[in-house]
Design a protein with these regions (language model features):
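Bacterial Sec-dependent N-terminal signal peptides
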Residues: 1-25
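Proline/serine/threonine-rich low-complexity linkers at boundaries of modular beta-sandwich domains
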Residues: 19-33, 119-123
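Short loop/turn motifs at secondary-structure boundaries
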Residues: 40-42, 47-57, 119-227
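Solvent-exposed loop segments of extracellular immunoglobulin-like
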Residues: 59-68, 154-155
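Solvent-exposed segments in extracellular or luminal domains encompassing
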Residues: 79-99, 177-179
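Conserved Ig-like domain signature around the intradomain disulfide
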Residues: 96-104, 190
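Beta-strand-rich extracellular modules
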Residues: 103-107, 197-199
Length: 227
């Protein structure tokens, strides 16, 4: 009786405990300087978009899993890229949808197991430039820049010329602009010329040429006249 009890006790204390590894694949990215994260999809994002994918494993115990992040474009059966890290970063610069699937292999004798898929959708491009601005210090429309509805512009270069064809300013940041000055001094009110060369994530090339009117005496409705 004692021997049987000893054997049962020994078995209870020597049987291995099953630990189930868990993963929580998550995409981390930034929109307008705000940190964002998603476990299922990123919808209608603007390019270029840098996303860090993390497997976020837990309860691994003695398990040392191998990771595969498979990047597949919508409509394709095969991934265009595979990454083999627990955490990987990718910059999306093309319009369309991409599925990012995390597969995990626990040992050399098992097939990769699909954990989950995160879908990233990049919008088509859009770029428009206004034909006037009023750099009068009222805090409204003081900077000449691309309209706020721009989307997925991955290359951008804008040039400002005066009436004699002389370049007086240029910028390459889609969120930048011109304050109506040249060499630190305000330019005269009147008509100037903008040339914009840009490229969208969908491959569309922009070659925008138009007049730009400086309206220094114009006060936007609702703006304060105080300095």
């Amino acid at each position: 009786m004692r021997i049987r009890a000893f054997i049962i006790t020994l078995l209870l204390f020597t049987l291995p405990t099953m630990v189930l590894a868990e993963f929580n694949p998550t995409a981390y990215y930034t929109v307008d300087d705000q940190a964002m994260e998603s476990t299922d999809f990123i919808n209608d994002a603007q390019a270029p978009l840098t996303v860090t994918f993390k497997a976020n494993p837990s309860n691994l115990g003695n398990t040392n899993p191998a990771y595969e992040w498979r990047f597949t474009k919508e409509g394709s059966q095969e991934p265009f890229m595979v990454r083999y890290e627990e955490e990987t970063t990718f910059e999306f610069v093309e319009s369309g949808s991409t599925s990012v699937a995390l597969y995990v292999t626990y040992d050399s004798n098992t097939e990769p197991e699909l954990i989950s898929t995160i879908k990233v959708s990049i919008s088509i491009s859009l770029l428009e430039m206004p034909n006037a601005f009023s750099p009068n210090g009222d805090g409204v429309n003081d900077i000449y820049k691309a309209k706020d509805n721009h989307k997925s512009i991955i290359e951008f270069h804008a040039y400002i010329f005066n009436r004699w064809g002389q370049k007086i300013y240029d910028w390459t940041d889609i969120n930048g602009g011109w304050d109506g000055t040249h060499n630190g001094k305000q330019v005269a009110a009147g008509v100037y010329y903008v040339l914009v060369k840009a490229k969208g994530s969908d491959g569309r090339k922009y070659n925008i040429r138009r007049d730009v009117n400086i309206l220094r005496d114009y006060i936007e409705e609702g703006a304060s006249n105080n300095p």
